[in-house]
Design a protein with these regions (language model features):
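Soluble ligand-binding/transfer domains with enclosed cavities or grooves
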Residues: 5-13, 17-167
Length: 167
């Protein structure tokens, strides 16, 4: 039987070197910054500590059991969200693990649709994250109401481009 907590730890535990790339609503890089993420289990608690290397600022997220909003697949990939910011705005996060590499996406939707995407490239300690060239400009194509962003080869983000305003 699939144990999401054990699977999450099996594939995500360790020290990850990363590069966060902030994209605007058109898939154009706004800025990027290096990070370090430590994922470990201590006394039954999963501890995640993200360090922004340029400033030394740290953010932590700790939990004993997998949050009810988190889905974990057998390969260690996970999704978290959507988390409501306001009645019409939300954010969601998705992670895909492939061996010692991982890609994460944090998408923020506002009142009128997509506001911002943070594309995260991570490699387990011992390797440098292989971030896309600067500045990143996603290749974009449409398929009906969907927009497909391609930040790098073999990675596609399927986004709902419909306007969300009420009225």
């Amino acid at each position: 039987m699939h144990d999401p907590r054990a699977t999450l730890l099996q594939h995500n535990r360790g020290h990850w070197q990363g590069c966060f790339i902030r994209l605007d609503g058109s898939g154009v890089e706004q800025d990027r910054f290096p990070t370090s993420l430590q994922v470990q289990e201590r006394d039954g608690v999963i501890e995640n500590c993200l360090t922004y290397l340029a400033t030394g600022e740290q953010k932590s997220m700790n939990f004993e059991s997998v949050p009810f909003t988190m889905q974990v697949n057998e390969c260690g990939g996970w999704s978290l969200g959507p988390s409501a910011i306001t009645p019409l705005a939300w954010a969601g996060e998705l992670s895909v693990v492939h061996g010692d590499e991982r890609r994460r996406v944090v998408a923020r939707h506002g009142f009128h649709g997509l506001d911002q995407v943070v594309y995260i490239v991570e490699t387990k300690a011992g390797g440098e994250p292989c971030a896309p060239s600067q500045p990143l400009q996603c290749t974009i194509r449409t398929n009906g109401d969907w927009v497909i962003w391609q930040p790098e080869p073999h990675v596609e983000l399927l986004l709902d481009a419909r306007d969300r305003h009420m009225g």
